[in-house]
């Protein structure tokens, strides 16, 4: 990712952008709008296909070369004009050199007709960093997944079934890598049966390459002065489904209703993602209200713990950060959240070395190093060291995010009732005692480590880690703190009249009553972050017994990745794939014995603000047969079946 960069543009006398790297235009100098409508919308017959969609049906468009977003905006405009109200559009686009936000705004200003759609895109076009980035519009009716990086690196990571292709890279003579047999093979792998394709080029080697990949291609009249272009239909075989234990369950058909058990961030996000797709969701919380456990802290930190080595966890964090950061735009800045930035101090030599590797691996608008003087100037208080600054990050009031997600139309909240689930016919039923409170064909467990109270998930290796935060009254002097500062702990600028600092880690205690010892420990973490801030707060003079705070349990897994996705029935799984205990390289051709309609969203540890909301989108994609919003390898690394598979291969149970 160290070579990731925004597009370098020149602007012609008419204010139109040109790529400096490829020496080519982004769209026709005569009429980019009409060109898009002819080459991509008409060739793919999108007007009639959009109009024919049924309630809850989705059409997926794939694109090579997002560029200025013009094709996406034109498709969205047409969809709104002709598609039935209950239909949805998914758009997946790969782009190696995304435009900077200011350049995108300048380019889209050329098309006043598209202003409502352009403004919506620009409003979500933030925290757009390498990898998969998920954006949503029109209350979730329009989904955009940007794959930011080289097409031949990104597309093999994509799990999707594309109904229509826009091939819109720069001209083959200028950008030959975008028109290679390897890319055509990826288009074929990702294509739904009879997927259509349109492209402005009529180059013979492109036509022959697409035919070789399984597309029936023909030359058709081009736009404007271009005599010919290409259109086609995929007629090749369907792609191999891959390992059956990670294969998609059959997309849900029938009544679109779901139960979500758990009113924390994972549950609220899961409910919101389904409700945005037209589902009726019953959100069940055993406490009197939402966000009463780990999601109930007054301030959480939107902090990216990344790796320079592209691990699944690091890629999840990078994609999840962008998604959450865009969600936060719905909330009240300064009260519910603040993009004040996060400064991670280089508190020892090992941490300084790690930070140097990260600064070399990621773009500067995501993170960059500061020396001590720069860090102090930015933070507003004296610090023991410089560190790594994340300018788009900050603090969040998690209950506000939970409330906003749970307010999505289509969600009904049942609070104050602990339930157990029982399968009855084609439904999951939520029972409180002998009373069935709600029923639906699909259920999502989002109760952190307590998902193990439900028999199908009882053997999953989740553990609870107690954490305590301390609330300190702000003083006139402490209000100088302008950014979150982290070392082994963290301290945030004040929300209202209080700072939050923490958080402790206790692997043994099951007691949620705040302790004086952990308040003292949090003050020591603050002393390591900034003795100056400790003094400004007068913390040494505050009686410990008068300090306020709260404790909750984080839920984590052995590999620190969450559990997100469908779950198999364990005994049937062991029987179906017993051969793996003898030879883990085998891939038996046996369908996974899924527990019908049961999904999990749990195990987010201390990263829930970043990973839980995007995990709601991942669940919805699993359920609805949509493009996964994460690389397939990352989705598999988060799959609940990974632990069933691990135990089978190792000859272990439980």
From Swiss-Prot:
Region entry tRNA (mnm(5)s(2)U34)-methyltransferase, spans: 1-235
E.C. number(s) listed in UniProt: 2.1.1.61, 1.5.-.-
Keyword Phosphoprotein part of the UniProt annotation: no
Cofactor(s) the protein requires to work: FAD
Record keywords, A-Z: Cytoplasm, FAD, Flavoprotein, Methyltransferase, Multifunctional enzyme, Oxidoreductase, S-adenosyl-L-methionine, Transferase, tRNA processing
Reactions catalysed according to its record: 5-aminomethyl-2-thiouridine(34) in tRNA + S-adenosyl-L-methionine = 5-methylaminomethyl-2-thiouridine(34) in tRNA + S-adenosyl-L-homocysteine + H(+)
One CC-aspect GO term: cytoplasm
Residue numbers spanned by region FAD-dependent cmnm(5)s(2)U34 oxidoreductase: 261-654
Family: In the N-terminal section; belongs to the methyltransferase superfamily. tRNA (mnm(5)s(2)U34)-methyltransferase family.
Name listed for the protein in its UniProt record: tRNA 5-methylaminomethyl-2-thiouridine biosynthesis bifunctional protein MnmC
Source organism (scientific name): Pseudomonas aeruginosa (strain UCBPP-PA14)
